[in-house]
């Protein structure tokens, strides 16, 4: 599941200058959506590139003032000044609901429901059956029946939970272990907005179970075309990438964060191996190192198996002398990879990072093991022999 952060920035927030400051802070932090009134859509487009959701309105003047496609939101939201926010009483029979009718007729694709009491929970469920996105906001965070909505709505809609802080966002993402798909943040604090985006990123990160494999062979393998993956991010001392010749077993190769007497640290770089090798990607797939180019995403992993995404700035390919490293897993499987013969290339071991030039037969390495083969980088349930 890919989580997202929506930022509330309609006229309830304040005047346009106040809303503009909030939206700008959101753009700088990396929010995914901005929720505004219909009249502000074009203004938001001028500030930057972001998905824009707008409360739908029948105000003809607003529609006439809109200019071209810049004034068209990515999602129309029903519920403000209606039944969804309590301005209009809920009908006894939901078939007579104006908000639900707007969703059914395609006049809106997103529902906004403020949970004022228990009567609004079934209304939110009814909206979720016809809405692409369902925003639920509570007057009091503690009474939002988020667990019930997550359990009953399932995958019928993208469930967006209203929050006022990063701490509330974290709770929303973790509720029932499944969590909300997204949060709608109502805050002017740029730091709180950034923290909420960080919570989103953490919720999306895969946590891998790293294993060990024992070196059975390490030998010079001649020259090959070696790939340095230069990312657009600074990598930490315990971070690197998972690479290898066999997709079923990938080696943990550290980033070049350590100083050397011979070369300066390159904390954005992983000297990943030869062009044929696989590197793991954030979606759980793999790419050949030779395929990587600027703008691609790779998965970065740390010593505890925590992962994050990094964008590739460039892939630098040069002919270099290589080692062939072969290792055996606990179940007797054999995996291997080619790594440059240089003291600056380090791999993860139970005793810490070790230069490939210092490795010996019998040493243990940290690896990531997975079942199945790969076809165009996607896992498939098929017997594939790699040797």
UniProtKB/Swiss-Prot annotation:
Q: Supply the InterPro entries for this chain.
A: DHQ_synth (IPR002812)
Superkingdom per UniProt: Archaea
What enzyme class is recorded for this protein? oxidoreductase
Q: Which reaction does it catalyse?
A: 2-amino-2,3,7-trideoxy-D-lyxo-hept-6-ulosonate + NAD(+) + H2O = 3-dehydroquinate + NH4(+) + NADH + H(+)
Which of UniProt's keywords are assigned here?
Amino-acid biosynthesis, Aromatic amino acid biosynthesis, NAD, Oxidoreductase
One GO term in the molecular function aspect is: dehydroquinate synthase activity
EC no. given is 1.4.1.24
Q: Name one GO biological process term.
A: amino acid biosynthetic process
Chain's role: Catalyzes the oxidative deamination and cyclization of 2-amino-3,7-dideoxy-D-threo-hept-6-ulosonic acid (ADH) to yield 3-dehydroquinate (DHQ), which is fed into the canonical shikimic pathway of aromatic amino acid biosynthesis.
Q: What protein family is recorded?
A: Belongs to the archaeal-type DHQ synthase family.
Under the heading NCBIfam families, the entry gives: PRK02290.1-1
Q: What is this protein called?
A: 3-dehydroquinate synthase
Q: What is the lineage of its organism?
A: Archaea, Methanobacteriati, Methanobacteriota, Stenosarchaea group, Halobacteria
């Amino acid at each position: 599941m890919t989580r997202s952060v929506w930022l509330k920035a309609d006229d309830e927030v304040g005047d346009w200058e106040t809303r503009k400051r909030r939206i700008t802070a959101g753009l700088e932090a990396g929010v995914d959506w901005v929720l505004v009134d219909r009249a502000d859509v074009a203004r938001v487009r001028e500030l930057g590139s972001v998905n824009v959701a707008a409360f739908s309105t029948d105000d003809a003047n607003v529609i006439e003032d809109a200019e071209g496609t810049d004034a068209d939101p990515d999602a129309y939201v029903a519920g403000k000044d209606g039944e969804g926010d309590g301005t209009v009483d809920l009908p006894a029979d939901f078939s007579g609901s104006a908000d639900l009718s707007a969703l059914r007729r395609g006049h809106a694709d997103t529902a906004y429901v403020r949970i004022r009491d228990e009567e609004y929970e079934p209304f939110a469920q009814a909206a979720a059956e016809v809405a692409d996105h369902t925003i639920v906001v509570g007057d009091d965070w503690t009474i939002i029946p988020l667990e019930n909505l997550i359990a009953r709505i399932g995958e019928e809609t993208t469930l967006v939970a209203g929050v006022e802080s990063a701490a509330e966002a974290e709770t929303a993402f973790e509720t029932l272990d499944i969590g909300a798909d997204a949060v709608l943040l109502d805050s002017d604090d740029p730091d709180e907005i950034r923290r909420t985006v960080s919570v989103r990123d953490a919720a999306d990160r895969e946590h891998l179970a790293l294993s060990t494999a024992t070196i059975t062979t390490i030998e010079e393998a001649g020259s090959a075309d070696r790939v340095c993956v230069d990312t657009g991010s600074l990598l930490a001392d315990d971070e690197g990438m998972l690479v290898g010749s066999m997709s079923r077993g990938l080696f943990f190769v550290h980033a070049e964060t350590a100083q050397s007497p011979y070369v300066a640290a390159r904390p954005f770089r992983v000297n990943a191996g030869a062009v044929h090798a696989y590197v793991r990607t954030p979606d759980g797939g793999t790419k050949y190192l030779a395929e990587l180019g600027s703008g691609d995403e790779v998965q970065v992993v740390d010593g505890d198996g925590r992962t994050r995404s990094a964008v590739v700035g460039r892939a630098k390919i040069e002919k270099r002398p290589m080692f062939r490293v072969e290792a055996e897993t606990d179940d007797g499987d054999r995996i291997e990879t080619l790594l440059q013969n240089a003291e600056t290339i380090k791999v993860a071991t139970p005793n810490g990072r070790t230069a490939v030039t210092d490795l010996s037969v019998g040493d243990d390495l940290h690896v990531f093991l997975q079942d199945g083969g790969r076809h165009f980088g996607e896992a498939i349930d098929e017997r594939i022999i790699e040797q």
